[in-house]
Amino acid sequence: MARYIGPKTKIACRFGELIFGPDKAFSIRNSSSSRRKKKTSEYGIQLREKQKAKYIYGVLENQFRGFFEKASRSRGITGVVLLQLLESRLDNLVYRMGLAKTRAEARQLVSHKHITIDNNVVNIPSYLVKPGQIIGVRERAKSLEIILDNLIRANHNKYSWIEYDKSSMSARYLYIPERMDIPENIKEQLIVELYSK
């Protein structure tokens, strides 16, 4: 399956929530939709939750399964560890820092070699950042309008596990967030049940 690049509103309406962030068209389409909902099977509910998580984090099936397998081999609750791994992805942390409006935009910044880890350029969006590492903006990218505009609007104190330094346009990944800290509306246990079949 290829990465979805179609209208985000259509997907958000399917799940009945703003999984991609603010969307003016969402409330209009969602309120005007009067389709009768069919009763969904247990498998359907679990599959839907997995698809929602994949859309939110912009991860394809093979990668998502790889994260699940890694989580299932780890100590701790598999579903929680899965979300913690997704939260530790470089593209997600660039998004959480406020350098990008969306994770898709963050992925582009990473792929175009605008982002560094401990002063080394990393262009792999799925790179897993370790606590203590510093995510920065490459010197030549610090004047990019898209980054500057996003930083003006960003709330740098929103996530306690990211310590942002305005002067250097960088942030330290302090610690892996607990489940209660992760704001995404995902029922991770349903995903665990789906993969455990």
UniProtKB/Swiss-Prot annotation:
Q: Which residues form the signal peptide?
A: none
UniProt xrefs under SMART domains = Ribosomal_S4, S4
Q: Does the keyword Zinc apply?
A: no
Which GO-annotated molecular functions does the record name?
A: rRNA binding; structural constituent of ribosome
Pfam families (UniProt xref): Ribosomal_S4, S4
UniProt keyword Ribosomal protein, yes or no: yes
GO CC terms of this entry: small ribosomal subunit
Kindly list the biological process annotations in GO that this record carries. Answer: ribosomal small subunit biogenesis; translation
Question: Which PROSITE patterns does the entry mention?
Answer: RIBOSOMAL_S4, S4
Which ranges carry the S4 RNA-binding domain?
A: 88-150
Keywords attached to this Swiss-Prot or TrEMBL record, sorted alphabetically, are: Ribonucleoprotein, Ribosomal protein, RNA-binding, rRNA-binding
Q: What does this protein do?
A: One of the primary rRNA binding proteins, it binds directly to 16S rRNA where it nucleates assembly of the body of the 30S subunit. With S5 and S12 plays an important role in translational accuracy.
- Similarity section: Belongs to the universal ribosomal protein uS4 family.
Q: How does it assemble?
A: Part of the 30S ribosomal subunit. Contacts protein S5. The interaction surface between S4 and S5 is involved in control of translational fidelity.
Could you tell me what this protein is called? Small ribosomal subunit protein uS4
**Species this protein is from:** Azobacteroides pseudotrichonymphae genomovar. CFP2
What lineage is this protein's organism placed in?
A: Bacteria, Pseudomonadati, Bacteroidota, Bacteroidia, Bacteroidales
